[in-house]
C-alpha cells in the first residue's frame, strides 16, 4: 500500500495512532521513488540508509503529536546543502561533494523530525528552465514523459507530481519553483526574498535566490513553509519579519479582496488557451467575491533582459570559488596552477553555465559596467516601482505562471534566448523580491496550466488565502498523472 495520496495531516494522524511507523512510511516512500524513478528521473541521490536510520531514531523516541511534520519524508533540491549527503548542484564540478554542514532550511526540517529522503535533479547550478542542463540526467514531465518538467527545480516538482514524495524543497532565482510547479500541476511558492535563509544554498544570483516549498495542495505548501522559514544570523539578507502561521488565513473567504490583472501578462507571446484559462480563473475569483481589474506593469517587458544581466553578473562572481583546488572536480591534465584553473573550469562547467559566466563577466568589465550592469539595476528599480504602484490599490496580482504549457524535450535547450523568454512572467517577481505562488488552474492539450498569484512583501498568508479559496472550488489539484495513479 502506498501512502502518497494521503495529506500531511492524514499521515500525521496515522503516525500518532501508530497505525504506521516512521520507518514504514519511509520504506513505502523509498518504494514509490524506486518504482517511478526510471520514468521521470527526479533524483540525483536517494539517501536510503540515512533516511531509514533517522526514521528508526524517530520511532524510538516516539512521534510528537504536536509536531505535524514528525516522521514526514522530504526531498531536497541538490543545490541545498545536506551534511553527509552528496550535494552536486547537478554539476560535474561538484560530482563528489559532501557538505560538512546542513543548510539552515534543512536544519529547520531536521529540527521538526522531517526525514530527508534524497536530493532532486535540477539544471546545473540552477541555470536553466527545463532540467536538461544537469550533468547527471534529464528529468521528464510527470504528465508526459516526452515533455520537460520545467526548471531549474524540475526534480523537486516531478517528485511531488509523480507521487514519489509528498513534499519537497526547491530554489527560485527567476521562476525555478513556480515554472516547474506549473508544468507539473503542483503548488510551488517563491517566498519573499529573505523569508527562508539562503545559508547553505549554493549561490547563483545572490540578490534573487530564494528557497521555497512544493506540495500537492496549498495548505500543505504553507505547512512546509512554516517549517523552513526563519530568521538566520548566518544569512545577512535574512528578513526579521515573520508570520507565526502561514496557514492562518486558509479557509477564510476572499470577499472584498482586490486583485489586479496586468495586461502585459496576457499580451504578446502568451498561448491563447492559457490566456483563456487565466480569464476563466479571474471570473472564478469574482464569483468568490473578489474584484478583478486590469492594470499595467509597463516595465515588466524589460524583465528578462534585466534579469540575465544581473543574474549572470552575480553568477560570474559566485562561481569563481569553484577552481578545483579545495573540493569537487579537478582536471587531471594540468601541468601548472593556471592550467588547473582553466582546465578544471572548462571541463567542470556545462555549456549553459559557461555562457552565463561569460555574459556576467562581460557585463561587469571595464567600459561596459555602466552600459549594462548599472543600467540593469536602474531598470530593476522601475520594475519595483511598477509593483509598488499596483499594490497601493490592490491586494494581489493575478496572471499565468508561464506563457505556454510544458514544451518538448530537446526543443529549446539549443536556443538560449527562447529558453530565457519562457521565464518572462516569473522573473519580475524575483527582481522585486516579492512572494509568488503557482497553483493548478486547468489543462491545455492534456498538460497542466499554472496560475500565478503575486503579493506585496511578507503577504504569503494572503496569497495562500486566495490560492486556497480557488483550490476549494476547483478540482485541478485533485487530477493526477498516470504515473501517480490518475487517468490523465
UniProtKB/Swiss-Prot annotation:
Oligomer status and interactors: Heterotrimer of A, B and C subunits.
Q: Which Pfam families match?
A: Amidase
Active site location: 77 (charge relay system), 152 (charge relay system), 176 (acyl-ester intermediate)
* Keyword Nucleus applies: no
Question: Could you confirm whether the keyword Disulfide bond appears in this record?
Answer: no
One example of the protein's molecular function in GO is: ATP binding
UniProt record similarity statement: Belongs to the amidase family. GatA subfamily.
Q: What is its EC number?
A: 6.3.5.7
Q: What is this protein called?
A: Glutamyl-tRNA(Gln) amidotransferase subunit A
Sorted UniProt keywords:
ATP-binding, Ligase, Nucleotide-binding, Protein biosynthesis
Q: Which organism is it from?
A: Streptococcus pyogenes serotype M3 (strain ATCC BAA-595 / MGAS315)
Principal EC category: ligase
Q: Which gene encodes it?
A: gatA
Q: State any GO CC term.
A: glutamyl-tRNA(Gln) amidotransferase complex
Query: Its function?
Result: Allows the formation of correctly charged Gln-tRNA(Gln) through the transamidation of misacylated Glu-tRNA(Gln) in organisms which lack glutaminyl-tRNA synthetase. The reaction takes place in the presence of glutamine and ATP through an activated gamma-phospho-Glu-tRNA(Gln).
Q: PROSITE patterns, from UniProt?
A: AMIDASES
**What does the record give as the reaction this protein catalyses?**
L-glutamyl-tRNA(Gln) + L-glutamine + ATP + H2O = L-glutaminyl-tRNA(Gln) + L-glutamate + ADP + phosphate + H(+)
Q: Name one GO biological process term.
A: translation
Amino acid at each position: 500500500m502506498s501512502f502518497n495520496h494521503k495529506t500531511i495531516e492524514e499521515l500525521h494522524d496515522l503516525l500518532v495512532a501508530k497505525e504506521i511507523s516512521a520507518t514504514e512510511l519511509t520504506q513505502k516512500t523509498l518504494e514509490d521513488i524506486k518504482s517511478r524513478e526510471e520514468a521521470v528521473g527526479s533524483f540525483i541521490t536517494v539517501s536510503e540508509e540515512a533516511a531509514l536510520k533517522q526514521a528508526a531514531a524517530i520511532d524510538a523516541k516516539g512521534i510528537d503529536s504536536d509536531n505535524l511534520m514528525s516522521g514526514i519524508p522530504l526531498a531536497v533540491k541538490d543545490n541545498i546543502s545536506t551534511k553527509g549527503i552528496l550535494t552536486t548542484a547537478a554539476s560535474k564540478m561538484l560530482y563528489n561533494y559532501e557538505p560538512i554542514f546542513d543548510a539552515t532550511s534543512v536544519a529547520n526540517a531536521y529540527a521538526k523530525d522531517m526525514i530527508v529522503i534524497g536530493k532532486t535533479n535540477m539544471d546545473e547550478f540552477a541555470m536553466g528552465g527545463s532540467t536538461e542542463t544537469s550533468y547527471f540526467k534529464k528529468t521528464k514531465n510527470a504528465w508526459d514523459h516526452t515533455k520537460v518538467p520545467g526548471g531549474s527545480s524540475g526534480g523537486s516538482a516531478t517528485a511531488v507530481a509523480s507521487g514519489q514524495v509528498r513534499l519537497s524543497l526547491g530554489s527560485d532565482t527567476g521562476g525555478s519553483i513556480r515554472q516547474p510547479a506549473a508544468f507539473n500541476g503542483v503548488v510551488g511558492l517563491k517566498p519573499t526574498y529573505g523569508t527562508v535563509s539562503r545559508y547553505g544554498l549554493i549561490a547563483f544570483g545572490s540578490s534573487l535566490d530564494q528557497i521555497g516549498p512544493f506540495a500537492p495542495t496549498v495548505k500543505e505548501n504553507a505547512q512546509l513553509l512554516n517549517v523552513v522559514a526563519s530568521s538566520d544570523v548566518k544569512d545577512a539578507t535574512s528578513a526579521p519579519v515573520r508570520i507565526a502561521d502561514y496557514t492562518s488565513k486558509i479557509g477564510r473567504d476572499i470577499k472584498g479582496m482586490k486583485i489586479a490583472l496586468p495586461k502585459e501578462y496576457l499580451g504578446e507571446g502568451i498561448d491563447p488557451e492559457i490566456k483563456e484559462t487565466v480569464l476563466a480563473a479571474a471570473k472564478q475569483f469574482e464569483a468568490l467575491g473578489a474584484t478583478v481589474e486590469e492594470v499595467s506593469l509597463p516595465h515588466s517587458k524589460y524583465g528578462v533582459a534585466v534579469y540575465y544581466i544581473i543574474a549572470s553578473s552575480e553568477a560570474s562572481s559566485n562561481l569563481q570559488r569553484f577552481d578545483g583546488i579545495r573540493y569537487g572536480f579537478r582536471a587531471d591534465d594540468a601541468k601548472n596552477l593556471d592550467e588547473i584553473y582553466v582546465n578544471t573550469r572548462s571541463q567542470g562547467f556545462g555549456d549553459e553555465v559557461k555562457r552565463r559566466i561569460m555574459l556576467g563577466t562581460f557585463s561587469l568589465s571595464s567600459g561596459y559596467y555602466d552600459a549594462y550592469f548599472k543600467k540593469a539595476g536602474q531598470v530593476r528599480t522601475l520594475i519595483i516601482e511598477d509593483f509598488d504602484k499596483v499594490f497601493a490599490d490592490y491586494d494581489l496580482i493575478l496572471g499565468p505562471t508561464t506563457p505556454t504549457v510544458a514544451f518538448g524535450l530537446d526543443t529549446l535547450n539549443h536556443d538560449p534566448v527562447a529558453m530565457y523568454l519562457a521565464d518572462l512572467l516569473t522573473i519580475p517577481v524575483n527582481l522585486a523580491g516579492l512572494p509568488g505562488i503557482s497553483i493548478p488552474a486547468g489543462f491545455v492539450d492534456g498538460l497542466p496550466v499554472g496560475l500565478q498569484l503575486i503579493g506585496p512583501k511578507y503577504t504569503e498568508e494572503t496569497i495562500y488565502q486566495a490560492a486556497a479559496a480557488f483550490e476549494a472550488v476547483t478540482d485541478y489539484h485533485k487530477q493526477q498523472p498516470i504515473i501517480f495513479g490518475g487517468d490523465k
